[in-house]
Amino acid sequence: MIHYVIPARKDSKGIPFKNRRLFEYTAKTIPKKEYNNVIVSSDDEHILLTAKEYGFKTHIRSQDSASDESSTKDFMSEIINDMSLVGDICMLYLTYPQRTWKDVCEAYVFFNQLEAKSLLCKEPLQTHPYVCLYELDNSKGSQVISHDLCRRQDYPKCFKICHKIAILKHDEIKKLNSNLYNKDTVYFSID
């Protein structure tokens, strides 16, 4: 059994009510046969009403898990407990309107083929961490990763985590960090 969880907070620091605008992009990609497996969690009555119009299940997100300080893990733990979710859970953030249902299906196949317990997506880096420095006082800096390499060809391959699609076994949540990964997480590449 797979549950598709869509987190949709009401407040946004950058663009007011952005999730109201983004919700339709995600909702329209989900096939009708999956509607009964979709749970929209929000503290926004408008989004919850729209979700019900689609036939999705709804969850009223607590103030704690909807705050700016709460982590993705806090939210996922809450919905797993509140809704008594068992099995696989796929989280679909609204901030990826270019995500397709094909992407979701391919990620789930990848997850199952590797017999994974958690999955995030990965993206290419724009800037390698070997050329990043911590900013110090007096216009100085300190390497984020200590090394003495100058040729980029010698740098280890790196990627950036991405929550375009996150999949996890319900009982894995306690073993994940605040960003939903650990040493056993697998990473799915979406171009």
State each model region's role.
Residues 74-75, 97-184, 189:
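Conserved core of the sugar-phosphate nucleotidyltransferase
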Residues 2-41:
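N-terminal glycine-rich phosphate-binding loop and ensuing alpha1 helix
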Residues 9, 63, 123-125:
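Histidine-centered beta-alpha loop that forms part of the nucleotide-sugar donor binding/catalytic region
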Residues 6-8, 42-43, 93, 122:
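Short beta-strand/turn micro-motifs composed of small residues
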Residues 35, 85-86, 115-117:
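Short, high-confidence coil segments that cap the C-terminus of an alpha-helix
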Residues 29, 45-90, 98-106:
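Short phosphate-binding loop-to-helix
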